[in-house]
Amino acid sequence: MRSAALAVAITVLLTSCSSSDPVAQQPQQSTPVQPTCSNTEADQGSAWIKGQLEAFTNEDPETAYSFASESFKAGSNLEQFIAIIVSNYGFLLSTSSYTIGDCTKQDELFLFDVEVTDIAEQKYSMKYTLSKIAGNWGVDAASVTVGEDEPLYS
């Protein structure tokens, strides 16, 4: 019942936020990607992604939103965030497993390869973009990497 109520609420929100494009929110920078993040950066960023993915699986949009970066929150409120997830990333709400792969650093951003498997065993390759500002991690963007080079998973 909670799922149905959440889905209805989110669907209503979609009509007012359908012009939001999460891919367009990703920073467009041409700085070359450095080979890897430090072990600490990879561990901390992975823990942040894991927390958000678990919140989605537990149908807890408020907690999932709390993992977003301050810059993301400045541009999208909770209702818009829910609309983005439902319209573009509904599979996150039915995740059965996930693997967090390689981390690369680009300027002040951390790019993580993530593979999500939903309850129907469909796999989704994703790229998560995180920032760490004044010691605080945040998810800036996430996108499905359909048609791109397959990321490496450890």
What are these regions (language model features)?
Residues 13-16:
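C-terminal motif of bacterial Sec signal peptides marking the signal peptidase cleavage site
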Residues 19-58:
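Short, low-complexity N-terminal intrinsically disordered segments enriched in polar/charged residues
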Residues 37-47, 57, 61-111:
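Short solvent-exposed beta->alpha transition segments
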Residues 51, 81, 128-129:
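Conserved short hydrophobic patches within well-ordered secondary structure
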Residues 102-154:
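Exposed beta-sheet edge and beta->alpha loop/turn motif
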